Amino acid sequence: MDVLSAVLLALLLIGANAFFVGAEFALISARRDRLEALAEQGKATAVTVIRAGEQLPAMLTGAQLGVTVSSILLGRVGEPAVVKLLQLSFGLSGVPPALLHTLSLAIVVALHVLLGEMVPKNIALAGPERTAMLLVPPYLVYVRLARPFIAFYNNCANAILRLVGVQPKDELDIAVSTAELSEMIAESLSEGLLDHEEHTRLTRALRIRTRLVADVAVPLVNIRAVQVSAVGSGPTIGGVEQALAQTGYSRFPVVDRGGRFIGYLHIKDVLTLGDNPQTVIDLAVVRPLPRVPQSLPLADALSRMRRINSHLALVTADNGSVVGMVALEDVVEDLVGTMRDGTHR
């Protein structure tokens, strides 16, 4: 083989190595949510990449096979070609062979590492979806041609993995962390896929796992309660009407003569009892008031209050003492934002 043909073949092998490295890193790094969004926009190559990602072991085996073969052939062809090129172009025929071969090998390794490995890898990491959509379609042609070899090496690798107790996976784990979801939501806002209200709502929904009951609880000093009229009886209709006029709320905790919480009343429970302010409300009408620890995550508090169908709950400290109260509305508002109505204050 003449020098020019050998040099061109070496450059072709470096390009092939770069192709396989780029395809491999693009497949691993491409985010499925972005690819699905591109597919919905009519990008057929995005669908191709998604399907390729569902056969990840075969795709990666093919890339490794291509990289390995390209590297071996480059070493076989490239180093002798560079030796001849140096001898002819720079008049180094008198240089000791050992030094000349060492210099040639260093040049080939540098070109291989820079152009065949680092550059394509960083291009793929900088724009994985774009790179995957560019490289995967022709890469799949190679995979079809090399399928017997890929299947053989893939089966051998899976057998070895099972021997050491590792279960092979057919595709990447697509589970993402809260931080990654937050990043996706922020990117969707910047790209115009979400408006500000949707962005706020989704951000609040993610935050609910880190928010505690203590973050939305109303302190005891700010609670408007109604007191029973006498031991063993409930509050009066007049007392409830007064609390309603002062606050506009529809639910009020009930306390005994000692200030201890015994339940809560909904205003609709009182409407059917007449309009005499002196009428004493039967304690049977008073609804139970559950307790939730202040350290309980809001998501768990929401589930618990919905399960027992309670709109109010006492908030307790670690020692069991009551430190405040939380309303189901407060928990929901922390998730979706403030909901205003005619009585909101």
From Swiss-Prot:
Protein's cellular compartments: Cell membrane
Coiled coil location: none
Recorded GO CC terms: plasma membrane
CDD domains: CBS_pair_CorC_HlyC_assoc (cd04590)
Membrane topology: Multi-pass membrane protein
Gene3D superfamilies in the record: CBS-domain
SUPFAM superfamilies the record matches: CBS-domain pair
CBS domain segment(s): 217-280, 285-342
Keyword Membrane: yes
Domain of life: Bacteria
Keyword annotations from UniProtKB, A to Z: Cell membrane, Membrane, Repeat, Transmembrane, Transmembrane helix
Protein's name according to its UniProt entry: Uncharacterized protein Rv1841c
Provenance organism: Mycobacterium tuberculosis (strain ATCC 25618 / H37Rv)
